[in-house]
A protein has these predicted regions:
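Active-site acidic/histidine proton-transfer and metal-coordination neighborhood
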Residues: 70-162, 255-256
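N-terminal pre-domain/capping segments
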Residues: 1-86, 255-257
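A short acidic, helix-capping loop that chelates divalent metal ions and anchors anionic groups
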Residues: 34-35, 66-72, 106-111, 172-173, ...
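Hydrophobic faces of well-ordered beta-strands that scaffold small-molecule active sites
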Residues: 3-9, 23-27, 58-62, 99-101, ...
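Charged helix-capping and loop-helix junction motifs
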Residues: 40-45, 76-85, 113-123, 175-184, ...
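Active-site beta-loop-alpha junctions enriched in small/polar residues
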Residues: 8-12, 28-32, 63-65, 104-106, ...
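Histidine-acidic metal/acid-base catalytic patches
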Residues: 2, 16-18, 86, 146, ...
């Protein structure tokens, strides 16, 4: 897992962890679109410049507030396309070759067939002019089952469009077991978000603090996921979870600085 593990900048201890371990970084500074311009952008750029000293590589998390790829309003769809294109440009400037995007599915707003059809169209259009090395990973958030995302991927032809399974979101949003999510989405995964919770709330707890058997989950990912599938630790703290990963052998001694 060493070269595939990233630490999210939402983790309060991400700076300390980068000093102690050889990890990649998932940049969350631009989850808020306002940070892509003005003083927000300047502050984010300063922080990213500092992180480059220790980070092994970068993944960028795209903005997601009020951005819906399957939007019914054409102007809303255009806004999503513009913001994601701006985020992709920032990712490339930062040296990130992978960007995480939210699926944008909202229950009771979009019929699933509509969301499915429009999502295929949107993501194919979005990726049409991107560099060959650039990949997106579409993350489940309010998605209540994995089958729609798998069906979407079966229709998508661009190999640089993959899925991001957020285990914590699947645990607290869906009645489908997380391990079933993994089995269904594994052929299409390019990335994973790992954190735990009580099965009801998106709390981003430490890996062992919640309803998901994280050891069983990680062991199964190693068995069925592609070897280039990256993983981001997305807990609020971070330190305790990385120490657990090291103690369990998911991180080798070579990953310690």
């Amino acid at each position: 897992m060493d070269k595939r593990l990233y630490i999210a900048t939402i983790c309060s201890s991400h700076r300390e962890l980068l000093r102690r371990y050889k990890l990649g970084v998932e940049l969350d500074q631009f989850c808020m679109a306002a940070n892509m311009t003005g003083e927000g952008r300047a502050a984010a750029d300063r922080e990213i410049s500092e992180l480059k000293e220790h980070a092994q590589s970068f993944i960028l998390h795209a903005p997601f507030n009020e951005l819906f790829p399957a939007a019914i309003d054409p102007d809303a769809r255009a806004l999503a396309m513009r913001r994601f294109n701006e985020a992709a440009q920032i990712a490339i400037e930062c040296g990130a070759d992978k960007m995480v995007v939210h699926s944008g599915y909202v229950p009771f707003v979009y019929f699933k067939e509509w969301h499915l059809d429009r999502s295929v169209e949107f993501w194919e259009e979005f990726m049409a002019d991107k560099p060959e090395y650039f990949m997106i990973a579409i993350e489940n958030v309010l998605d209540d089952e994995p089958y729609m995302m798998a069906e979407m991927m079966s229709r998508i032809t661009n190999p640089n469009i993959r899925l991001c399974l957020d285990a914590g979101h699947a645990l607290c949003v869906s009645k489908v077991p997380v391990m079933e999510w993994l089995e269904v989405t594994a052929p299409y995964l390019g990335h994973l978000h790992i954190h735990n919770n009580d099965g009801q709330n998106d709390e981003h707890r430490d890996l062992t603090d919640g309803q998901l058997d994280m050891e069983a989950f990680l062991d199964r990912t190693a068995e069925i996921c592609r070897q280039d599938t990256t993983i981001t630790l997305e807990t609020r703290g971070g330190l305790k979870s990385v120490e657990w990963l090291a103690a369990k052998g998911y991180l080798s001694p070579e990953s310690i600085r």
